């Protein structure tokens, strides 16, 4: 933008100067009519041209300053938007915002927080309905072999390769508080899965389906855990590049070797697609509650298998840590 302003400022004096030189140099009769001879008119022309050059230089300097100011403001704006995660808002604050205020801010991928409340589970014995359960991951680690040779497999930090669409939301189900203080939650409905891909330090990408389908968690509010269903990352109708699928496509796309020895197991993995589900485990902990508004927040940690590419690859363990928010009615 600064270059365009400078170009405009340079062109304007040039256009202004052109007719001035044309009129002053038109003919000697016009000079004599005003009482000037040719030499005086020439000096006058040079004087006007020098003034125009000064004006052009000032316009150029002003354009440079304007361009620098615009670039500085752009850097400030981009720096403000790149500072990191936005401020965490309460449920009411999020509901009060318009679509355009939320769009592109990162708020849609965040779980709400609680203002005030108590740092304990302050709900009495009884049966409730847990609604608007939100699970926001803050860390993805994958159990894999280290870069160093002979190093045992361990959970390694990863780089997120997908957009900020990994938060689960609007999950609901029955929630019960027993007389002995234990709680029980059963997941029934909601946006309970999200496809995520992360990258290991060595460059390997690990896709998985972050989910809590059919979760049944029991225990004390400080730590209640349970198992859940992890569906196949790909559906049975998905076709691989050779047209093979679980419920559609070719049965075999690679011919069996003569004699049927040596590669049977590898060929079976590629030809026969496995879309069976697996199991994950999650532990939730309550860190703060607000009974007057029915809100509760906490942290969670889950371990689940990654994608198997329809049975052709061994799954990796994925550890997901984050925060959660819910409302009890």
Swiss-Prot record:
Compartments where found: Plastid, Chloroplast thylakoid membrane
GO CC aspect terms: chloroplast thylakoid membrane; photosystem II oxygen evolving complex
Cleaved signal peptide residues: none
One protein family per Pfam: MSP
InterPro entries assigned to the protein according to its UniProt record, in alphabetical order: OMP/PagP_b-brl (IPR011250), PsbO (IPR002628)
Transit peptide residue numbers: 1-82
UniProt keyword list: Chloroplast, Manganese, Membrane, Photosynthesis, Photosystem II, Plastid, Thylakoid, Transit peptide
Principal localisation: plastid
GO molecular function: oxygen evolving activity
Superkingdom, taxonomy of origin: Eukaryota
UniProt record, GO biological process: photosystem II assembly; photosystem II stabilization
Transmembrane segments: none
Function: Stabilizes the manganese cluster which is the primary site of water splitting.
Family membership: Belongs to the PsbO family.
Full protein name: Oxygen-evolving enhancer protein 1, chloroplastic
Organism of provenance: Fritillaria agrestis (Stinkbells)
Phylogenetic classification of the source organism: Eukaryota, Viridiplantae, Streptophyta, Embryophyta, Tracheophyta
């Amino acid at each position: 933008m600064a270059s365009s302003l400078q170009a405009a400022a340079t062109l304007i004096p040039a256009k202004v100067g052109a007719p001035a030189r044309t009129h002053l140099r038109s003919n000697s009769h016009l000079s004599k009519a005003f009482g000037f001879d040719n030499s005086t008119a020439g000096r006058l022309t040079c004087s006007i041209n020098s003034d125009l050059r000064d004006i052009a230089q000032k316009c150029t300097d002003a354009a440079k300053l304007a361009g620098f100011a615009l670039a500085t403001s752009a850097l400030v704006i981009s720096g403000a938007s790149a500072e990191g995660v936005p401020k965490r808002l309460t449920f009411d604050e999020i509901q009060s915002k318009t679509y355009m205020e939320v769009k592109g801010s990162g708020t849609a991928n965040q779980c709400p927080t609680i203002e005030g409340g108590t740092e304990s589970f302050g709900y009495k014995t009884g049966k409730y309905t847990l609604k608007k359960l939100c699970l926001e991951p803050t860390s993805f680690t994958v159990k894999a072999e280290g870069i160093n040779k002979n190093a045992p497999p361990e959970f390694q930090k990863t780089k997120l390769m997908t957009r900020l669409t990994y938060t689960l939301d609007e999950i609901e189900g029955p929630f019960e508080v027993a007389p002995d203080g234990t709680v029980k939650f059963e997941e029934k409905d909601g946006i309970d899965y999200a496809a995520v891909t992360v990258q290991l330090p060595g460059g390997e990408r690990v896709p998985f389906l972050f989910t809590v389908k059919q979760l049944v968690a029991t225990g004390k509010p400080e730590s209640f855990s349970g198992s859940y269903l992890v569906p196949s990352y790909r559906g049975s109708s998905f076709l691989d590049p050779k047209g093979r699928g679980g419920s559609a496509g070719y049965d075999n796309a690679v011919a069996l070797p003569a004699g049927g020895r040596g590669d049977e197991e590898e060929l079976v993995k590629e030809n026969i697609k496995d879309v069976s589900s697996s199991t994950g485990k999650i532990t939730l902990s309550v860190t703060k509650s607000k009974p007057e508004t029915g809100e509760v927040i906490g942290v969670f940690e889950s371990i689940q298998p990654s994608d198997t590419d329809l049975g052709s690859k061994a799954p990796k363990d994925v550890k997901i840590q984050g925060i959660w928010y819910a409302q009890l009615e």
